[in-house]
């Protein structure tokens, strides 16, 4: 288990949370900005799960970063920097699941559409789930789940059928129940 956070308080909370649950993890020797200094440059993960900051406009970008294999992300929005960072750290059969703002599914500003197209054309996108707004306490914007797979070949050991050239789209925007004026909760029903 490896984690990375730029904020010292978030890093300490993650360490405490992991310790309480009995998990061991490599959080690096200190907090660091993922885009300025990747603490795990050689990490290739089987699974990546993430909830990066949505639409972050205040991020560091180096145009020649090797992680930008599918296109240089725009300076004003880190969404596709995060996506490519996750892909960069996947093992050859690795999978990633993460949440982003819904705009990440349709934005065409500053090359974002080209990056998204490249991800689809290289068959990395396994599933997209559009969710309703008001799921987070920190923002009311609608969000989506991205699921990426480095390999969509059949894998009996993992219980996967051949999914090459297939992408599942799920429209879940109408799901959930408002629990108060500004918060929605997804339920089993």
Where is each model-derived feature located?
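Intrinsic structural disorder
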Residues: 1, 14, 22, 95-97
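A conserved structural/catalytic subdomain of Rossmann-like adenosyl-cofactor enzymes
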Residues: 38, 42-189
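Short, small-residue-biased leader/transition segments that mark boundaries at the very start
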Residues: 2-7
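S-adenosyl-L-methionine
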Residues: 9-43
